[in-house]
Amino acid sequence: MISMKYRDLRDFLSLLEQRGELKRISQPIDPYLEMTEIADRTLRAGGPALLFENPKGYSMPVLCNLFGTAKRVAMGMGQEDVSALRDVGKLLAFLKEPDPPKGFRDLFDKLPKFKQVLNMPTKRLNSAPCQEQVWQGEDVDLSRIPVMHCWPEDAAPLVSWGLTITRGPHKERQNLGIYRQQVLGKNKLIMRWLSHRGGALDYQEWCEAHPGERFPVAVALGADPATILAAVTPVPDTLSEYAFAGLLRGHKTEVVKCLSNDLEVPASAEIVLEGYIEQGDMAPEGPYGDHTGYYNEIDNFPVFTVTHITQRQDAIYHSTYTGRPPDEPAVMGVALNEVFVPILQKQFPEIVDFYLPPEGCSYRLAVVTIKKQYAGHAKRVMMGVWSFLRQFMYTKFVIVCDDDINARDWNDVIWAITTRMDPSRDTVLIENTPIDYLDFASPVSGLGSKMGLDATNKWPAETPREWGRPIKMDEDVRARIDALWDELAIFSDKDAKR
């Protein structure tokens, strides 16, 4: 599966630069708003990753738009193109529910997958590049880092690509998650994690098991691409993100123990923030412009106190912005969509395709095409999408179509909705379900409704009426006209080029 390997972020950047996928910007650019505007224009044009070498007021370069195209997401996962991410999804589906070999030949066919599993354990180092420079105590100062202030009405600079590492009580496995963090002071950040996310669950369990005790936290900035992408990929609960990163990378993830706690961080990370959350220490976070295209409301979240900053020599700060799609999370969603498909198909073989349109904020609307086998089949698939993977817990709309519809073509999907649906019969509404806290359209924060649209052809049990047959030209006629088409010269060469 692996075709490209990177030991660290710098290794990846070198390859991107060789391929014209990285642009160095030497002009002084301000992290306050200017970087966002440049990054946004570049991403919308399908441009390269950006390395701002001279941020105004800082000596540390800033990396933006690293995963600003689906191709670069695929490259970060060790693949040459997005279509190959289906193989990543197949591997995850296998790891989620491995099928035992049915015989010697089947065992032989599965050997490559078993060999990849050998790369899953982490490799622990005694020293690491991420600890080449150390600040602690009074020397800790987050203002040394050129944290971007992305939008005019944002409350403060925002750490956007922090890989947060936590461990719940009595757990061996660490959790890795990407949570935005508002800069609150020279040694304090606000950790905005939603209650169902791994870091928040670890913290809740810690508070129950160790009342009053500080909760250890580490945040890695600028990890290698495999580790970053593993943190946003739907890995099985039994598999750690570090282990999956090893599979993607083709060799074990190298980690090192923090200086102030027992958490293990990526050894090659550019910057690591170590510290703790004091139980009950909360602060109002926001407002911030987010991936919906709006500023979100203010809410209280835990305060992360930083006791140590460690970093590499000549560290690079990895950052991004979020806004109305397309933004970097939306682009990543398009690529990771290919990972989801095989996982869903293993559980629901009738699924032909699954698509999360980026304009739907990457997860709020899903289009599913199926090989329909019985009356009510579409409703079963809706319920399956909402319940099978927690990544779709916040998906508000699920549209189910037949397999003659292209899930990724709105012309097809809208035609199916308007010709195969009766709004009363074919719409499913479910109230009081979990909803994204950023969704201000829901009547209650974190709680709202979901809608399923059955845009499939209806079976006799679903309607007493004779169902329409799609118009289709005779194949012999199509073949004759294909052969005659160029001779007809209906379009001139000039018109054809248009």
From Swiss-Prot:
Its cofactor is prenylated FMN; Mn(2+). Binds 1 prenylated FMN per subunit. Mn(2+) binds at residues 175, 241. Its EC number is 4.1.1.98. It catalyses: a 4-hydroxy-3-(all-trans-polyprenyl)benzoate + H(+) = a 2-(all-trans-polyprenyl)phenol + CO2. The keyword Membrane applies. It is found in: Cell membrane. It is a peripheral membrane protein. Disulfide bonds: none annotated. Keywords: Cell membrane, Decarboxylase, Flavoprotein, FMN, Lyase, Manganese, Membrane, Metal-binding, Ubiquinone biosynthesis. The keyword Acetylation does not apply. The active site is at residue 290. Pfam families: UbiD (PF01977), UbiD_C (PF20696), UbiD_N (PF20695). GO terms for molecular function: 3-octaprenyl-4-hydroxybenzoate carboxy-lyase activity; metal ion binding. GO terms for biological process: ubiquinone biosynthetic process. Homohexamer. Catalyzes the decarboxylation of 3-octaprenyl-4-hydroxy benzoate to 2-octaprenylphenol, an intermediate step in ubiquinone biosynthesis. This is 3-octaprenyl-4-hydroxybenzoate carboxy-lyase. It comes from Yersinia pseudotuberculosis serotype I (strain IP32953).
